[in-house]
Amino acid sequence: MNKELSIIVPMYNAERTIEKCLQSILGQTYSNFELLLVNDGSEDKTLQICEAYAKKDKRIRILSQENKGLIKARKLGVNAATSAVVGFVDSDDWIDADMYERMFA
């Protein structure tokens, strides 16, 4: 089944906030999405936290690059996306559980 939505999360040293962000995305009532986590050269445990989540959920893909900034991290995610519809969530944000269900309603 093709995913209708690609959610891109650019990350840089987000170990304090990334778990709450990921939980809010993975807890969506709408589940037909891929989750692209773009590690922008984090020097903390951000990547390890994301790898643990990726082992548990096949919708997650991790992309990594040297630290190039938010815009280039988002662009890397967009270029890797397989869906026509793209959504962005920053690594220090979280979203309502029905956000994407409402978007596709």
Predicted regions and their residues:
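Nucleotide-sugar donor-binding/catalytic module of glycosyltransferases
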Residues: M1-A105
